[in-house]
Amino acid sequence: MKFGKSLSSQIVEMQPEWRDNFLSYKDLKKRLNLISGGAAGERASKRRRVGGATAVTVTAAAAGGMTLEQAGFVGLLDAELDKFNFFFLEKEEEYVIKQKELRERKMASAEEVMRVRKEIVDLHGEMVLLENYSALNYTGLVKILKKYDKRTGSMIRLPFVQKVLQQPFFTTDLLYKLVKECEEMLDQLMPTNEHSVASEDGKDDSEGEEKGSKPSSSSSANGGAVPGEAEAEDERSTDMKSTVTAALRALREIRSGSSTVSVFSLPPLHGSNGQDEPGR
């Protein structure tokens, strides 16, 4: 599957507030198609600078040795970086606060501990999604920059990627640490055999559904919640598991698309129990 289609299918699986914060891959491809290839195309594009362009845009493009179309493309790339960083840092801060709260609550009553355990599983899933968000956007940037260099004969991919490596959205050390701390909390709250089942993304859910059909199990697993609330929580957890599974599958497909390792390759995925979990 081509990257654009893979990214689109991934975005559809995400929660609404995530969707507009992924790489605008289609918009970048449209901008790229406006750029004429080769020296003749560059001369023609330069002649079009005079049209509706502002003096500031013309000056910036000329100073960088770019056509207006090229400057517009790079400007959109920079705007995308700002978008990634804002969303990533906002989510990371949210997860730090939530994890601190859960760490304090896990010492509460037995019923509350069961609810906390469920919330930790959901938080773990969201953080894995954010790791995938980082990796997918990085992959998209590398791919669109490769197309840009090929079309224009420029060599901006390497310097731009070097800049990307310093961006907050790509620096996931703290996030990876939070994921591991979540797993440690689950180890403390969950029996070993139960933990292994809960952590296996993509595994058959029939066993879990069978357990959920027992009234006593449903009640305790949700901290004594009323049936309607319990069903809603179970549905949210199922949706989260499906989304995480789809995210990991999409990322595996992207990584397996090429066996060639280069300076632009994503680092190896960190994982537990043989499962792929991206982190850097």
From Swiss-Prot:
Gene: SPX2
Region described as Disordered: 191-244, 257-280
Function: Inhibits PHR2 DNA-binding activity via a phosphate (Pi)-dependent protein interaction. Together with SPX1, plays a negative role in the regulation of leaf inclination by preventing RLI1 transcription factor activity in Pi depleted conditions.
Subunit structure: Interacts (via SPX domain) with PHR2 (via C-terminus). Interacts with RLI1 in the nucleus to prevents its positive regulation of leaf inclination during phosphate (Pi) starvation.
Keyword annotations of the record: Nucleus
One Pfam family here: SPX
InterPro entries: SPX_dom (IPR004331), SPX_prot (IPR031142)
Protein name: SPX domain-containing protein 2
GO biological process: cellular response to cold; cellular response to phosphate starvation; negative regulation of unidimensional cell growth; regulation of leaf development
Observed phenotype of the null mutant: Slightly increased angles of leaf inclination due to longer lamina joint with greater lengths of both adaxial and abaxial sclerenchyma cells. The double mutant spx1 spx2 has abnormally inclinated leaves. Altered leaf inclination phenotypes of the rli1-1 single mutant are suppressed in the triple mutant spx1 spx2 rli1-1.
Subcellular location: Nucleus
GO cellular component: nucleus
Reported tissue expression: Predominantly expressed in roots, leaves and seeds. Localized in leaves lamina joints.
Comment block on domains: The SPX domain is sufficient for inhibition of PHR2 binding to DNA.
Induction of synthesis: Up-regulated under phosphate (Pi) starvation in lamina joint cells. Up-regulated during cold stress. Up-regulated by the transcription factor PHR2.
Residue ranges constituting the SPX domain according to the UniProt record: 1-162
Domain of life where this protein originates: Eukaryota
Note: SPX1 and SPX2 have redundant functions in repressing the activity of PHR2.
Species this protein is from: Oryza sativa subsp. japonica (Rice)
